[in-house]
């Protein structure tokens, strides 16, 4: 959600901080600010709205400061106003930025007010610099080089909640202190300079050597090096790792928006997944899939529970379908935010899968942590079997919770809306379902080979769909830009695609849209239909094709304009649908990888036609790191 950037070194800090904040815009924000230290003074500049407002203010101020922190804020405590924007400063000069929530800020605020501290915002973050200042004030007159670090450490030990911090102070101009407690923060290593950020895209232009902090760690960054401690004050020895990230991933490379670029990157995502997950006939494998998961994860498996949020939840629904149909394992999909407070009864030999693009989704991590805790100390059959599916294997998911990961291979996704990461999650579920089927021998070798061969053709099929759909969806966008409501229908494995299509449209165009199982339309949603409510129906030849066509006819009888996502261009489909968004003809089991593409493009073009911010839609954050 919020984005943090910090710098200390030999270059002008302001430009580096601004560039880093631009790379974190995808996380969502409503205000921004930067604070630098120069000649014993703090220069703090904040602005409501987009970064260009902050940049305009900074252009009026020239400072050669070589240390500073920056922040993009997504409002949780207090309105999105300039006075609530970060950084927050105490008159004694500590300055802090924070991502997360301080749960006990009210009692700390009252305690500090009683000691004479004056607060100027409504945020929870403002207690942090005041608390640090109060602790520094109580230190002895003989200052120590470790005073600032010690003050931040003492302050952090009084904070309750999930947060990441970056703090500077005018009295300690050569120190940048950073903290992680259940919110992401990564340190970057340069030559005589160091960086910190909420996410690696902010610093990849300057360094490939990074070290993600772990929960309960605090680091002091100086021009001479980095010291890392735990909250108990014990120094830790840690080494950075080299980041395998191409800088072109964080630029548009000729596309108007990141979202459009990322939609067009999906064939490459499927190819990368095929290369990584499938053995290509090499080696003596029991399964044609190579996910590098331990055998005991599959042993005597009876049930699977999947926890996820948003688009990842839709991917999980397709995963459920694949696992049950191919591997014959009963699978349940839960909203992580609900599962935390109403978990299923404890069952034996159960695999718990957490799906999170960022690896930092607060509710998903909390659901996995709860599952891990409630199974601890139980007899062997109840032991926690945890698996994560994430696009960020360096995230909290692997480092703190889940010993087993299927790393999706989408690369960095900058657009707030999940497009290529959704496809990457689907590929992970195809691989998992096929691997389970091979291990359990619930599908013949010939069946597995047929599905895998079909998957190998998918990249070309997506490329063909993209080539044909760009113009068609752009034309439809012109006609539907002022539409107020949409209905999306699907059945079987394509019902989750109807949900995903509706979610994409409402997220980016702010048009009310709902997805339904096509068979449920007559049980309520049909009351909404008239000439002003278009209906998008996903009709793929297979077990439910005729049923979807029948449901579509019911909508047409109520004067709704029908848009068909289908490989069938003539016959009954050609007569029923007013508009066709054709996709290649593939096995029904593989069709979600294709049917989602025109729905992504339709949402994109409608939003662009309406003149909206495609890559940063209002009120949304790429990584939801608070509950």
UniProtKB/Swiss-Prot annotation:
Catalyzed reaction equations: D-fructose 6-phosphate + L-glutamine = D-glucosamine 6-phosphate + L-glutamate
GO cellular component terms given for this protein: cytosol
First-listed, main subcellular location of the protein, grouped into a coarse class: cytoplasm
Pfam families: GATase_6, SIS
Subcellular location: Cytoplasm
SUPFAM superfamilies: N-terminal nucleophile aminohydrolases (Ntn hydrolases) (SSF56235), SIS domain (SSF53697)
Active-site positions on this chain: 2 (nucleophile), 622 (for fru-6p isomerization activity)
Keyword Methyltransferase carried by entry: no
Listed GO biological process terms: carbohydrate metabolic process; fructose 6-phosphate metabolic process; protein N-linked glycosylation; UDP-N-acetylglucosamine metabolic process
Keyword DNA-binding attributed: no
Chain's role: Catalyzes the first step in hexosamine metabolism, converting fructose-6P into glucosamine-6P using glutamine as a nitrogen source.
Protein name: Glutamine--fructose-6-phosphate aminotransferase [isomerizing]
Lineage, highest ranks first: Bacteria, Bacillati, Cyanobacteriota, Cyanophyceae, Nostocales
């Amino acid at each position: 959600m919020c984005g943090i950037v910090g710098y200390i070194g030999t270059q002008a800090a302001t430009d580096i901080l601004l560039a880093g904040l631009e790379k974190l815009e995808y996380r969502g924000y409503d205000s921004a600010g930067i604070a630098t230290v120069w000649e014993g003074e703090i220069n703090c500049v904040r602005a409501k709205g987009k970064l260009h407002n902050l940049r305009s203010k900074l252009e009026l101020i020239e400072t050669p400061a070589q240390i500073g922190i920056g922040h993009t804020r997504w409002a949780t405590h207090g309105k999105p106003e300039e006075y609530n924007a970060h950084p927050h400063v105490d008159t004694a000069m500590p300055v802090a930025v924070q991502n997360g929530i301080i749960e006990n800020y009210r009692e700390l605020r009252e305690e500090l007010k009683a000691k004479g501290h004056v607060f100027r915002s409504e945020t929870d973050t403002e207690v942090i610099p005041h608390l640090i200042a109060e602790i520094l004030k109580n230190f002895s007159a003989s200052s120590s080089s470790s005073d600032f670090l010690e003050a931040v450490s003492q302050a952090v030990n009084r904070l309750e909640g999930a947060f990441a911090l970056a703090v500077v102070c005018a009295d300690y101009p050569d120190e940048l202190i950073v903290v992680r407690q259940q919110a992401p923060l990564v340190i970057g290593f340069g030559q005589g300079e160091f960086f910190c950020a909420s996410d690696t895209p902010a610093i990849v232009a300057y360094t490939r050597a990074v070290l993600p902090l772990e929960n309960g760690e605090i680091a002091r960054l100086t021009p001479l090096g980095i010291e890392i401690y735990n909250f108990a004050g014990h120094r830790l020895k840690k080494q950075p790792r080299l980041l395998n990230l191409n800088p072109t991933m964080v630029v548009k490379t000729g596309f108007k928006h990141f979202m459009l670029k990322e939609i067009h990157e999906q064939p490459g995502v499927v190819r990368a997944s095929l290369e990584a997950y499938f053995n290509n006939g090499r080696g003596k494998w029991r399964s044609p899939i190579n996910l590098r998961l331990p055998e005991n994860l599959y042993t005597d498996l009876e049930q699977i529970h999947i926890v996820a949020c948003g688009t990842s939840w839709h991917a999980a629904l397709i995963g459920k379908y694949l696992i049950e149909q191919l591997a014959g394992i009963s699978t349940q999909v839960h909203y992580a935010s609900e599962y935390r407070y109403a978990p299923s009864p404890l069952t034996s030999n159960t695999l718990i899968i957490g799906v999170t693009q960022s690896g930092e989704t607060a509710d998903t991590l909390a659901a996995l942590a709860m599952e891990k805790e409630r199974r601890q100390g139980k007899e062997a059959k109840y032991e926690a079997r945890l698996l994560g599916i994430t696009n960020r294997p360096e995230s909290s998911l692997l480092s703190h919770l889940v010993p087993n990961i299927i790393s999706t291979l989408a690369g960095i996704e900058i657009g707030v809306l999940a497009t290529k990461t959704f496809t990457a999650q689907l590929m992970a579920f195809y691989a998992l379902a096929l691997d389970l089927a091979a291990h359990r021998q619930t599908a013949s070798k010939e069946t597995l080979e047929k599905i895998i061969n079909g998957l190998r053709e998918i990249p070309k099929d997506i490329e063909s769909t993209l080539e044909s759909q760009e113009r068609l969806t752009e034309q439809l966008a012109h006609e539907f830009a002022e539409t107020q409501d949409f209905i999306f229908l699907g059945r079987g494995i394509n019902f989750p695609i109807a949900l995903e299509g509706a979610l994409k449209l409402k997220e980016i165009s702010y048009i009310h849209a709902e997805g339904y199982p096509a068979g449920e339309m007559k049980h309520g949603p049909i009351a909404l239909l008239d000439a002003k409510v278009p209906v998008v129906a996903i009709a793929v030849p297979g077990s439910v094709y005729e049923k979807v066509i029948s449901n579509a006819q019911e909508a047409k009888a109520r004067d709704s304009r029908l848009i068909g996502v289908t490989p069938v261009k003539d016959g009954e489909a050609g007569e029923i649908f007013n508009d066709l968004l054709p996709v290649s003809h593939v096995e029904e089991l593989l069709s979600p990888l294709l049917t989602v593409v025109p729905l992504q493009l339709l949402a994109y073009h409608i939003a662009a036609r309406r003149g909206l911010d495609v890559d940063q839609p209002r009120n949304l954050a790429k990584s939801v790191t608070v509950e």
